Amino acid sequence: MENTFKLLFETIGERKRNPLPESYTNYLFSKGEDKILKKIGEECTEVIIASKNNDKEELVKEMVDVLYHCFVLLAEKNISLEDIMAEVTERNGKLSRVGDRREIDTL
């Protein structure tokens, strides 16, 4: 699984360095951060709808779209997958108990 994410992230980075005219990834990079963020917002909304509709197949598809667009944002901001994995490692085991986290309604 990690290799699949890594390959996707590397492909996105390659599109950023060497744009292909017909590439959707290139289109997002050419439009900039605002377009990428808008797409993330749209895809997150679709995740919520798929979840509320209990549509597992659609939820999986929309989650892939969210991950893809988040990877594009990371590449746009020059944040590596290794940076993300280091943060996941750092957090592993921390704030894992309910009492360790703030309540959602207080955010």
From Swiss-Prot:
CC annotations in GO: cytoplasm
Compartments reported by the entry: Cytoplasm
Gene: hisE
Keyword flag ATP-binding: yes
Source taxon at top rank: Bacteria
HAMAP family tied to this protein: HisE
This protein's name: Phosphoribosyl-ATP pyrophosphatase
A GO MF label: phosphoribosyl-ATP diphosphatase activity
Alphabetically ordered keywords of this record: Amino-acid biosynthesis, ATP-binding, Cytoplasm, Histidine biosynthesis, Hydrolase, Nucleotide-binding
